[in-house]
């Protein structure tokens, strides 16, 4: 069951990241919508969007909506770090957000949001990585995690988060392919 919940493993909070690793993470953030597009380009798309990756999980469609919600939050958190306009993350309840009714609608609006957001977000992060390296240590306190999270950790976390949910969507596609 843990392999279905964390198909690529859980995020390692204790890892230190080199500039090269962070550049690679930004490329993964930039490319995530393209990888999602490849998964959506299937004859089994409708079945995949309704499939769950494990019992009781979100469907692929709900995962796409969640990624849009979560990655908008992450973009804003990165902006707060870079603009020095906040010192604490504004938490949000992802499960409550998934119950607001919009997760029932087609994935397409969230997909389009992810396309634009990831383009802008990756440019923001690449620009930050070109500047003063001390910005990577700048952080926000995250009350849900009980710790401060640096910009470097946010970059790595959300590269992981995108890969994590792409793996969930791949599991949904595998499930849809096994229906026949």
Question: What is the predicted role of each segment?
Answer:
Residues 24, 28-31, 62, 66, ...:
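Alpha-helical initiation/capping and key positions within long helical/coiled-coil segments
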Residues 22, 29, 33, 56-57, ...:
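Generic structural signal for well-ordered secondary structure
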């Amino acid at each position: 069951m843990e392999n279905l919940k964390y198909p690529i493993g859980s995020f390692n909070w204790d890892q230190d990241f080199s500039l090269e690793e962070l550049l690679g993470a930004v490329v993964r953030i930039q490319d995530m919508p393209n990888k999602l597009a490849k998964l959506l380009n299937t004859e089994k798309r409708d079945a995949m969007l309704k499939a769950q990756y494990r019992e009781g999980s979100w469907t692929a469609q709900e995962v796409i909506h969640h990624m849009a919600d979560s990655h908008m939050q992450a973009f804003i958190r990165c902006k707060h770090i870079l603009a020095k306009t906040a010192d604490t993350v504004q938490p949000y309840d992802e499960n409550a957000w998934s119950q607001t009714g919009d997760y029932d609608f087609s994935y397409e609006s969230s997909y389009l949001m992810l396309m634009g957001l990831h383009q802008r977000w990756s440019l923001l992060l690449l620009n930050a990585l070109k500047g003063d390296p001390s910005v990577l240590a700048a952080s926000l306190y995250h009350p849900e995690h009980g710790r401060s999270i640096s910009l470097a950790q946010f970059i790595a976390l959300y590269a992981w988060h995108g890969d994590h949910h792409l793996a969930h969507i791949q599991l949904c596609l595998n499930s849809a392919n096994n229906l026949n």
